[in-house]
Amino acid sequence: DMRAVLLAGAGDNGGDGLFAAAALAQEGANVTAIAVGRSLHEAGFASFVRAGGKVLVLDPAADIPGCASGFSAGEAGERLQTAIAVARKSHLIIDAMTGIGIQGSLRGIPAALASALGLDGEAPDEPALPNRESSGDFPLVLAVDTPSGVGVNDGSLPGPYIPATVTVTFGAMKPCAVLPPATFACGRIELLDFGFDIDDKDPDVEVVDNSFASDAVRLPRFEDSKYSRGVVGLVTGSQRYPGAAVLTASAAARANTGMVRYLGPERAQNMVLAALPEAVIGKGHVQSWVVGSGVPEASVEGTDGDMQRDTIAALLKHYALGSEDENKDAYDMPPIVVDAGALDLLPERVPGQVVITPHAGEMAKLLNRFETAASTAEHADSHEPYTADDVRLNPLASAKRAHELTGATVLLKGAVTIVVDEDHVYASGSAPAWLGTAGAGDVLAGLTGALLAQQDDVATTGETVASAAYLHGLAAAIASESEQQGWQEPELIGREHRQRFMTLGHPIVAGDVAHAIPEAIADVIA
């Protein structure tokens, strides 16, 4: 016999769960509803009882018709342990404890259940399978609208939560379904379209797709030259890490630009020319800059005499905001991608055409530096230091804070990459997990600089950067022949879908991604 357990809250989500549980009971399943609050949705409860479902109440203060209440604290503890045991032995758990109205972490009985049945504040650690396919272990978990315990609006994991095998969401996608790390707790996402009129609504998060990214690709004109198609200037690579120069140049050259100019040490110059004879060595007019990839931070031993850092520092001074004249000069500068070893050279305030591209560890260092400066300037108490794990567990808040502190457009790298500018949040989850490989960030930096060089208006910087993240992931998917992604589009309930096994793909190196960029661009503009 199929055994199912419903974790039912008092609200409408609990009601939806009760109706679903009633349908299962009518089909012959052995269904137990565990009431986690003091009441249950009236109509849903009546339907469930008529179908022969059983109810286990956990709160002594509950007022649910026909169910025990007023029991002792000792019995309440025994009931909780019984509920946990029944849930663990079931084939299916329907998670309908909480809805979109909850703020912060779970508390009380829901928190105790989530701690026992799920995870507490850490992201799921499991193989990245295509379409979030389940390992098949029981119990499977079906979340109603959102998994209980995730940060609905910011994608965080503030405390105990229950990872879902499948999440059925209603009307529209919730931010937690697309933002990391909560999106990884949603499993496969099924969307029930209620026909809501949301076209005139500003989304909390914009998910990048082919159509979105195509706008960032400048189609060639009949009268184009190498200069009008966009020239990218690179101050990347170093004596220590010359390969980064090759990767940024290779990516930029393959991303629809007319020319790549390279500035760097002789060893890196020779490697760039060997890999890309089309590159031009030396200074000249550019439409965008990429700096810092493969350049050691100041904290790395032996970087005192690194001319790359001196060149980058001199260039970034032109982007520093301050006096009225300085501001005008800064806003007149071309877009610049500040990556890796250049992040510690970033001025205190910069305009939005400055793009920073940290991973979680680099973001933690950057936030600590700028928070300390802000606290000193405001004579405020020092902040608690950020760690890389802090950033990974709440990347949206970290990216927003970095934008507030610096003014830069922020690209925070991850399985789902987040881009934040003055008015928007973008999420791109096109990349397969195979993209976690050395040099992938260098390729992204070069690709981003190339797309920025093609734009006429710096007001589109955020959209362009988000499109670069998407194309980067798409190129990795092409190179690895993988259909696994950081974020999968939901299935629309009611539409016919052909069930098929998706392709996991194979390992790649960063150079493979750079070489797949032209095919990715062809895909989005087709």
Sequence positions of predicted segments:
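Short secondary-structure boundary/hinge segments and terminal tails
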Residues: 42, 65-66, 79-80, 152, ...
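Internal gly/pro-rich beta-alpha loop/helix module
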Residues: 92, 97-206
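Nucleotide and nucleotide-moiety/phosphate-recognizing core
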Residues: 1-99, 103-144, 319, 325-329, ...
